[in-house]
From Swiss-Prot:
Its EC number is 2.7.11.33, 2.7.4.28. Keywords: Kinase, Nucleotide-binding, Serine/threonine-protein kinase, Transferase. This is Phosphoenolpyruvate synthase regulatory protein. It comes from Escherichia coli O6:K15:H31 (strain 536 / UPEC). Belongs to the pyruvate, phosphate/water dikinase regulatory protein family. PSRP subfamily. It is an enzyme of class 2 (transferase). ADP binds at residues 157-164. Bifunctional serine/threonine kinase and phosphorylase involved in the regulation of the phosphoenolpyruvate synthase (PEPS) by catalyzing its phosphorylation/dephosphorylation. GO terms for molecular function: ADP binding; ATP binding; phosphotransferase activity, phosphate group as acceptor; protein serine/threonine kinase activity. HAMAP family: PSRP.
Length: 277
C-alpha cells in the first residue's frame, strides 16, 4: 500500500453517489487516517457492478487491506454483487431505513434516483435553483448592480477572501440568490458603504480573513506584487472590518472555515431558509 494512504474508500451508488459521498466523508472524518477516495456513480446494471467488484478486489489483493465501501443501491441483485467483493461494505441508507421502518410501521418503497433525480414534485424547486445560480453568476464580484434588490444576501469583502465560492455554494446547494461586492485597493483611501448598497443594508454580510492567509493566497495569483504584500493585506482587512463595525454589518472571519461552514453560518446568522435539493 502507498505509505501515504491508510485506507482506500469507495462511494458507490446507482444514482449520483452524492449521498454516499456526503455520509461516507462524515463518517471517515471521525478517524485519524489518510484515505484514497474512489466515487462510482450510476452502478445500475450487473455488468457495471461486476466491474466495480473487480476494482475493489484488485485493491484488496494489491494492498492486503480491505477497502471500505459506502454504498446506496436500490436493486438487490446489484447490491449482492457488491457484497461479494473483498471490501468492508456499509449500506448507508438501509442503516437508517431499518429502524425508521420499525418506528413508523411502514414499508419503504425504494426508487432509484429519488434522492437527486427530477420528478414532477421537485421540478419547480430545481428551476428555482437554476435561476439562483444564473443570478449569482450575473452578480459575481460586482459585475452588475442591477436587480440587487432581488438578492437574498449580498456578500462583501476584499479580493480573495472567499466571496465567489461561498456565493456559488449558496446558490447551488441551497438555491439562494447571492450577490457579492468587492472592496478593492482603490477604495481604501476613503472606504464607505456604496450608495447602491445602503438601501439593502439588511441583506449585507461581510467576510474577512487573516492578513497572513490573504497575502499567501494573493501571492499565488500575483507574485511579488503590492496587491499581495502583507502590508497591503493588513491595511485592507483593517479598513473593511472598521466599515463592518461602523455600519453594523454582520461578518465572520473565513480563515479557518470551509466554504460549506461559511455558507451555513451565513444562513444561520441571516435567518435564510435552507432549501435542500
Amino acid at each position: 500500500m502507498d505509505n501515504a494512504v491508510d485506507r482506500h474508500v469507495f462511494y458507490i451508488s446507482d444514482g449520483t453517489a452524492i449521498t454516499a459521498e456526503v455520509l461516507g466523508h462524515a463518517v471517515m472524518s471521525q478517524f485519524p487516517v489518510t484515505i484514497s477516495s474512489i466515487t462510482l456513480p450510476f452502478v445500475e446494471n450487473e455488468s457495471r457492478a461486476r466491474a466495480v467488484k473487480d476494482q475493489i478486489d484488485a485493491i484488496y489483493h494489491q494492498t492486503g487491506v480491505r477497502p471500505l465501501v459506502f454504498y446506496s443501491i436500490v436493486l438487490p441483485e446489484i447490491r449482492a454483487i457488491i457484497l461479494r467483493s473483498e471490501g468492508f461494505c456499509q449500506d448507508i441508507v438501509q442503516a437508517l431505513v431499518a429502524p425508521l421502518q420499525q418506528e413508523m410501521k411502514l414499508d419503504p418503497t425504494p426508487i432509484a434516483h429519488r434522492t437527486h433525480g427530477l420528478n414532477p414534485n421537485n421540478l419547480n424547486k430545481y428551476d428555482a435553483r437554476i435561476a439562483a445560480i444564473d443570478y449569482t453568476l450575473a452578480h459575481d464580484d460586482g459585475i452588475s448592480l442591477r436587480n440587487l434588490d432581488q438578492a437574498q444576501v449580498i456578500l462583501l469583502g476584499v479580493s480573495r477572501c472567499g466571496k465567489t465560492p461561498t456565493s456559488l455554494y449558496l446558490a447551488m446547494q441551497f438555491g439562494i440568490r447571492a450577490a457579492n461586492y468587492p472592496f478593492i485597493a482603490d477604495d481604501m483611501d476613503n472606504l464607505v458603504l456604496p450608495a447602491s448598497l445602503k438601501p439593502l443594508q439588511h441583506k449585507l454580510f461581510g467576510l474577512t480573513i487573516d492578513p497572513e492567509r490573504l497575502a499567501a493566497i494573493r501571492e499565488e495569483r500575483r507574485e511579488n506584487s503590492r496587491y499581495a504584500s502583507l502590508r497591503q493585506c493588513r491595511m485592507e482587512v483593517a479598513e473593511v472590518e472598521a466599515l463592518y463595525r461602523k455600519n453594523q454589518i454582520p461578518w465572520i472571519n473565513s480563515t479557518n472555515y470551509s466554504v460549506e461552514e461559511i455558507a451555513t453560518k451565513i444562513l444561520d446568522i441571516m435567518g435564510l431558509s435552507r432549501r435542500m435539493y
